[in-house]
Amino acid sequence: MDNPRVVAPEEWLAARKDLLAREKEATRAKDAVDAARRALPMTEVTKDYTFTGRGGQVSLADLFDGRRQLITYHFMWRHAESGFPGEDQGCPTCSFLVDGIGDLSHLHACDTTLVLVSRAPIASIERFQKRMGWQVPWYSSYRSDFNYDCHVSFDEAKLPLEYNYKDKAALERTAPFIRSGTDAFGASVFLREGDRVFHTYSAYGRGVDQLLATYRWLELVPLGRQRHVTEFPYRDTYDPQP
């Protein structure tokens, strides 16, 4: 990418003010979309799901950890059962996202719990989490229907193929890598009212782009993102380390 043009301060200020107007317009549009997201209707979750964490088996309601709101990031796992024979580790793109998650205290203060969920044995998850040094609670949905019902694991013997609200025919045209026997990533949101749990929102693909903290910083600089999200390696594999 070429460097920006060098101009006089007056020309820079005029260009910056023009951009500011566009930024404010985009902010107002995003505010409206965010409000519409919050106003989405919700559906009650009636199926019993079992997860495994460090302390043993837990339910979906347990994942809230006493709070009213729950965000689950569907962390894709790379192993033979998801189309990656010979591997047993987390997805590097999902790892890039989780690298940007900091302390969770502010979320907790807003009655919101954030967890990671993967369709992998808990022993594999714990080994990879230790390697990466993350503190975000992480649960296994292995042998559970949760991933399938959230449309991030695919088995046409269980459910018709669907990802990002597209059916099999649309996926064959736009995302042929989504097929039976594979996994993908996404995020789902739940609300708890007493003992009742409701699903309010799920996003997939570019829908979780806004959660990529590194990109939010890179979008401020002239060189921009520089790499596609799939081109970022595990952070401990940079050679030499940045």
Regions found by a protein language model. Name each.
Residues 108-125:
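Catalytic nucleophile loop
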Residues 1-110, 127-133, 137, 143-242:
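Non-globular targeting/processing and membrane-anchoring segments
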